[in-house]
């Protein structure tokens, strides 16, 4: 009887600690910096003053990547490539097992999505609106000067601004102010 009570007590303690331990697990998905040309600054979050980025550094939720004039960077998240052009600021607002949310503050990114699952999980925001990818393809997003331009090389996307939402197919482009 005493052994049973002790066992129940230990199980109750473990049940209390298990949810906390599960929450502490890092996400299974991270990005990797795979190409760096020129000075690129990496900040782990908005409070981080930043450091020079290095190849193969992991990118997690909250990370901010800034490219200097004449620099570029490439980040892979599983089978998806995100290429940053010169003078670009990109924040990974969400990067977990279910979603990748990119916030492009300025500059240009090219996004290559290789499968439907990746396309459904990734979306991008700019100061002017949101871009949702409808399927695999190659996309370019440029933002600055109060305007965002979205070009679809292959695939299709939906671009949503303040007062409209438009589909953009392969070989097409859309602008939002």
Label each region the model flagged.
Residues 1-9:
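Bacterial N-terminal signal peptides that target proteins for export
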């Amino acid at each position: 009887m005493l052994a049973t009570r002790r066992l129940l007590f230990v199980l109750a303690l473990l049940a209390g600690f298990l949810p906390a331990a599960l929450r502490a697990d890092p996400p299974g998905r991270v990005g990797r910096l795979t190409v760096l040309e020129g000075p690129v600054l990496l900040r782990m979050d908005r409070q981080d003053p930043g450091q020079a980025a290095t190849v193969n550094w992991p990118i997690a939720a909250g990370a901010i990547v800034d490219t200097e004039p004449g620099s570029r960077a490439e980040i892979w998240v599983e089978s998806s490539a995100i290429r940053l052009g010169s003078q670009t600021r990109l924040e990974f607002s969400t990067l977990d097992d279910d979603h990748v949310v990119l916030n492009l503050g300025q500059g240009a990114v090219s996004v290559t999505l290789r499968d439907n699952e990746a396309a459904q999980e990734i979306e991008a925001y700019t100061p002017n609106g949101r871009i949702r990818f409808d399927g695999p393809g190659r996309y370019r997003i440029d933002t600055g000067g109060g305007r965002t331009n979205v070009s679809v090389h292959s695939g299709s996307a939906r671009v949503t601004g303040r007062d409209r939402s438009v589909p953009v197919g392969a070989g097409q482009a859309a602008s939002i102010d």
